[in-house]
Amino acid sequence: MIVRSLPAALRACARLQPHDPAFTFMDYEQDWDGVAITLTWSQLYRRTLNVARELSRCGSTGDRVVISAPQGLEYVVAFLGALQAGRIAVPLSVPQGGVTDERSDSVLSDSSPVAILTTSSAVDDVVQHVARRPGESPPSIIEVDLLDLDAPNGYTFKEDEYPSTAYLQYTSGSTRTPAGVVMSHQNVRVNFEQLMSGYFADTDGIPPPNSALVSWLPFYHDMGLVIGICAPILGGYPAVLTSPVSFLQRPARWMHLMASDFHAFSAAPNFAFELAARRTTDDDMAGRDLGNILTILSGSERVQAATIKRFADRFARFNLQERVIRPSYGLAEATVYVATSKPGQPPETVDFDTESLSAGHAKPCAGGGATSLISYMLPRSPIVRIVDSDTCIECPDGTVGEIWVHGDNVANGYWQKPDESERTFGGKIVTPSPGTPEGPWLRTGDSGFVTDGKMFIIGRIKDLLIVYGRNHSPDDIEATIQEITRGRCAAISVPGDRSTEKLVAIIELKKRGDSDQDAMARLGAIKREVTSALSSSHGLSVADLVLVAPGSIPITTSGKVRRGACVEQYRQDQFARLDA
């Protein structure tokens, strides 16, 4: 099905399979075991037309419409209705009631929406938030669930009148000012084709019949939006959805949704695999069979090989095949997908000498002093190159550099940020190798390397820790700590004596023990174990281990650690230490 836009794809689905289930939302708030609410393709299409008709009274083609609603079918209908009306959709979470929500403030200020689509359950928080923005023309606030969504509707919008931009995907905001990535209909369509080719490379990009997408990821996040809403429509596949809260309350629900008669395609960040393996009991899985799972991609944050192994081992007795777990790399600026692991086999890890890697050279090794990295297929589309970020010259095999991406899935830039757009999306390679375009290239800000035709990812360049003159990936240090603590942690460097940087680790723990004395003894034992592990695995001496309660470490909306904020909180002594 070749289409130019998401509304055109939805219209085709409604015409070709009107009575087939399109989106099913499992509501665990009504019932602990879940209540299934389903829309067919024709119902979904009719509802988006009614939202579009309502939006036709607000602004004109190309104006922005924010979707700020709880996770549910109303969010799906609102997002698609905004596109159907020729408006630029802006996916957003519901603002936090009664408190300052800097991210929502930034997005509303930057996008200047003519309308906000919400629901009756969330409208008070939305109104309260908008009211705190005096001096600006207020957007219309529309409660989608109060519209007559199933009314007959003759609303039409010509295909050639749609703006090229589909939506603004605001970055998860490791800084306080998230930028809106300008996503076109072409970006989304091309990236869908690329990800299908990557995940189903052995079947010409075509999944088997009776496949369905399963997702609990938030719709305002790039992976949640593409996997949960865009991919089902572009492929004509049914989707089974629930909310992040439902997953966090009981991770077994994710496993239940994938243990179905259909072939499930799902996605989650690394922490979700850890959580599901740790908190799902055998009783939870009684009578469940995971043998029909097609793919579970792990992305959005650094993929830890040890976590994947624990997840695969935990659910092997319920017929989960390790080969269906696909570590993946991508970013919002490239729509969502760039690369994945090789199909048909368990994820491959390779050990590299830590000392050499710190110096920028990938040297495979065996035994101690190694950093384990997951291998990814070097994709044909999009094109990926490893580039020296200072000289803009391609790096030879085995040399660490910045990952650059080129393809029609790459956005044109950030909304109303020309200078930042040029820096990020306007990369040009000096003296490119044969078959390599000069530009423009997306400079991802991620470090990695290619060797033996495989790509390896190290982490964010700006997060690189420099301790005593050596480069260290915080992801590697955090992975070592998490093998001991199993919780969230943050590795940061802060100024020390004599112009050196020192390593500090912030570690979330539950304070357990029959008495305060027992609890303190346990915390002391964990400190000693972490200190020893960092010394033996990384040759690092940790200057300070800060043990804090769960929820203390600042994170982005997608669950990534805000390391810059951690540094500021540490320097201002704002962390409440459990062992104080």
Swiss-Prot record:
It catalyses: holo-[mycocerosate synthase] + a long-chain fatty acid + ATP = a long-chain fatty acyl-[mycocerosate synthase] + AMP + diphosphate; a long-chain fatty acid + ATP + H(+) = a long-chain fatty acyl-AMP + diphosphate; holo-[mycocerosate synthase] + a long-chain fatty acyl-AMP = a long-chain fatty acyl-[mycocerosate synthase] + AMP + H(+). GO terms for cellular component: plasma membrane. Keywords: ATP-binding, Fatty acid metabolism, Ligase, Lipid metabolism, Nucleotide-binding. Residues 421-440 are annotated as: Disordered. Its EC number is 6.2.1.49. SUPFAM superfamilies: Acetyl-CoA synthetase-like. The keyword Ligase applies. Pfam families: AMP-binding, AMP-dom_DIP2-like. GO terms for biological process: Actinobacterium-type cell wall biogenesis; fatty acid biosynthetic process. GO terms for molecular function: adenylyltransferase activity; ATP binding; ligase activity. The keyword Ligase applies. Disruption phenotype: Disruption mutant lacks the ability to produce mycosides and mycocerosyl phthiocerol esters. Involved in the biosynthesis of phthiocerol dimycocerosate (PDIM), a cell wall-associated lipid found only in pathogenic mycobacteria. Catalyzes the activation of long-chain fatty acids as acyl-adenylates (acyl-AMP), which are then transferred to the multifunctional polyketide synthase Mas for further chain extension. Belongs to the ATP-dependent AMP-binding enzyme family. This is Long-chain-fatty-acid--AMP ligase FadD28. It comes from Mycobacterium bovis (strain ATCC BAA-935 / AF2122/97).
